[in-house]
From Swiss-Prot:
Gene field: RGR1
Any one GO molecular function term: transcription coregulator activity
Pfam families assigned: Med14
Protein name: Mediator of RNA polymerase II transcription subunit 14
Keywords of this entry: Activator, Nucleus, Transcription, Transcription regulation
Any GO BP: regulation of transcription by RNA polymerase II
Role summary: Component of the Mediator complex, a coactivator involved in the regulated transcription of nearly all RNA polymerase II-dependent genes. Mediator functions as a bridge to convey information from gene-specific regulatory proteins to the basal RNA polymerase II transcription machinery. Mediator is recruited to promoters by direct interactions with regulatory proteins and serves as a scaffold for the assembly of a functional preinitiation complex with RNA polymerase II and the general transcription factors.
Annotated localization: Nucleus
Phylogenetic placement of the source organism: Eukaryota, Fungi, Dikarya, Ascomycota, Pezizomycotina
Amino acid sequence: MPGLAMDGPSAMASRATVADMHYDPASASQQANGGIYRNGIGKKSHSPVDGLHDSHIGCLHELPPELSHITLGFFPFNNLISRVVQQSWNDLNELLNEMGSSQAYQTGISSQLSATKNGMSEKFRGDQATENSLKKLRILEFTHSRRAEFIKLLVLSQWSRQANEVSRLIDIQAFIRMRSGFYEAALFHIGNMKQNLIVAQLANPDLKTASHVLSAGKIDALHGLEFLSPRPLAPSQVLRLLRGINKLIDMRLALHDHVPDSLQNYFVHDGRVTFIVPNEFEIDLSVASAAPSAQFFLVDMKFLFFPSSLPKGRLRSIVDHQVNSTLMNAGLVGCFNLLHNLILTHKITILFKQAIDLARTYWSEHLRVELFHRTLVLQYWSKKPGGKSWIEIGVHSGLKGSPQSTGTTTSFLQLRWFRDNEEVSATDIDFNLTFLSAKSILFSAISLHITHILRTAFEALRQNRLYCLGGLYIGMSASSKEPGDCYLELQMTQTSHLDIMVEAVSGDTVLRVAPSPITRYDTEIIVDRGSVEDIVERVSRLRCVSALEEVERYAKAVGWMPLNLRHVNLESLKRIFPPSALRSMLLFRAKCWEPSWLAVFTSAMDGDNWWIVQLQTQNPPALQSHWRLLEAQRAKLITGWFTGWLGRLHNASFSSLLSALSGMIMVQCNVDFLNEIGAIHFFPPPKDLLLQPCLRVPSIYLRLRHDDFPSQFRTIFSGGSPRRSFIDETFRISYKGIDQQSGHAITMVYGRLMTDIDMFGALYAKSVQDIAFQPKGRGFAILFRTPVGTPIIAPLLERLQQMNNIAFVVESMKSQGFQPHSLSPLRIKFSYPTQGELRGSIKFIYHDQGSHFESKLLFPATTTKPILHPRIGIDFNYQNPHRRITESLSTILNSHKDGMSLVLELINITLPLLVTLERICAEEYIDNAWCFRAQYTARSARLYQIRYPFLRYRFNVSASQRKSYVVWVIQNSTPGPERSKHPSLELRLKDQIYNSQGDGWRGINQGAMAYSANVSRLVFDLHQLMKSYISQMAKSNQRGEPTDSSPSAGCEFGRYLPKNENKKGHIQTTTAPTLEHAYGNSNMVVQSVRQGEAAARDVDVIAID
């Protein structure tokens, strides 16, 4: 296919050499491409000389050479056909391969479905029809596309039939152009030759004049000089002449000539007047005549701006002639107008040349310079998208009606500045009319433009809370002359800085980040926004990325575990986070935290914030499968507006941050627990629980009244609870850090006791390691170590109630004279008031209700029933006689509403009786020890039975209330048949006990009564009577005599008395213990004693009998 011969300089180097460059002698006699192609079939071409006779061959050599054949841009038509055919073949193979693979898949499905019982289903037939339609459509599209290609080849083939003529036409055109070039070159050389021959021309010789000169020796045609040169003037004469001219000029300027306002700055000297126009020119004029109407003549002229140069040569002559003509016709006013307009035009021309030179440097693609009449336009940042900016420097008429007139009618150079298609004030641009510099003017305008952009960005960035509150530094440097001095400097984090500059030549925003690797995220160029929006967007993105990278780097260094956002349900995050926080977010976990807690770091221009997020506990993350997304339940912002909490990041600060986040998790889980309960008041409110400066975790203040104690956490004793609280209602919960060994959170709870209890704090803290009391004061502190994310409210309430119960028991003991010597939350060890060797202990046994105790602690709102149901037990040492009534005392403790006070009082009341019974039962005898042995049984704390097995006698000892005193009553409970066997003993009992009165006791019907302090004497007298009777019986049996009823008094009474018994034998009614003294109402006490005695008797009878 023949190509196209391009016309013009871009197609060939010169018109005269086109044929020489593409002339091929070997193929000069052939057609293009070696032959003529008709529909793709080439035929051998015939030379024009074929068929001629040999006689004509010689004549052909005299013909001019054939035209040079042009082959530029030609290529064979068969190559194009081969290429199209090959491409069609390749595309067809690809299409068949694709359809074959799809057909194999469809055939496999068809074979499987055909094996079924009913054959191919209708659904499959529909799918197969669709597949076949798609294949046919693809084949049709392929054939259409290929057909279009071959149609193009057909058109080219038909056109190639006339290619021979077109090729010849191209050769003729090239030949004509070559000849035209030769003709023009010949004319050019002839013209140059004619001009050069002017110098070689010589005039014809003047023979007549030459002969006259040779003969006469002179020339008559040459006349001599008719004037004489003046004599040289003396210096004094010159001075006098110049002074005269000065006076003449002064008089003319003062009296006759009109001096325009612009030429009022002049001075006369040296016979001339010098007019000075600042920033424009300085001109010297003088006069040639004394006449007032004589004109001024130009003496000298000088420009007062730089760069400038006076006209030289012919141009200077033209200027001088024009100035003198103007002085003659228009005077000084016309001269000023001429020179003023000339200077203005000259200045614009100088600035234009400077701008053109500047545009040919590195400003070439970003500066457009145009000159319209006398207005110079400099458009800078021409390739920057958005509004255009340019400077116009032109001549202003100076008319008073103009808005920018200076008050005079003199024209002047005016600078107008258009910034982003809007005209703005150009008063701040450095437009120096003395030192002309297009670069300085351009740099000044660009500096002010950059300052405007950066100031707008500065104001936009400073509106963010991160910078307006002083969390990070932001500053700006501005200049009206140098664009490089205009930049915006800000802190992205404590360790990274950002300098924002605008490139002066192109207007592109340049961000210089330290450290520099962060700039790899600044790849997005927003072309549809203004410069300010672009800067704010890029700075916001870089600042957030910088903060995220820095936090992630240090978090990984200290062992935090980052969590990918893809593992968390995005919808759940959208529900609990604001939209601004979702753009830049990092999720972390710590090994010491519960799986349901996360820490989230968000970065924005308003500040960097830390959040704690609680996941849904129904599906703990540790048990989820790898594909299940985590569900965020609630989020808590813990940093608030304070952004300078961490300072410069390093590993130590992140270790402190881990502790602070753990503390905030503890605070939040405790607050959530308190909100679930709803009965405990706390301060501050949840919205104010934020991290404080220096990573201080806020404390929680509780107000826990005894009456408002949550019912589900109240420990209710079956035998009653303290009626008042011994602990102040205000508590403070403070987080103290992480235990390095266990990884548990350390939480301290501070409180105060309501009253001072002697030695309570020292004894309690001695046995409990995680509690401490003030040495001199009522304050105490409780230490808790729990996993991070586990609330301490439930254990705290349990501890407080335990402490309150212990304080209640201790106060009750002290009121009864008992002395505690060891305290713990579950046991109190005490000693008796008078006999220190007798000791006991009261223990508290707490049992949880149900098997879901831990779930109730985590979800207290699911139940309103008390979780803990404690019981109180009492124990005594081996030497203590109260060990026999342990069961009875325990029953009273857990069944009576005032069980503790009643038990302590019973211990004091029963002590003399039990000591005496223990001693009489522990007596040892040498002879017939079994006859004298006495036994007693404690059926309850108020009922005892003394037995003498040898005689089969029984005496019941019971406590009862008489008026306001507790008395012991001894009654004979021996059956009648046994009594009838010992009439003398009955007689003795009647005389010495029933109808008698002893030391602190007196007899009643079939018994005796004694106060609690004197019951030991009554029991001892009874025992002595029984022992003397048995001794008498033993002696009578040895002699064979009947039994005598005379008693024996051979024993000392003092050895059986208890240590605190009064030996004088008087009944001390004033010191007798009373229940009314402790509780104030004797009837109520009697009733309670009887109810307790009945309950204890039933229990003891079952246990013993």
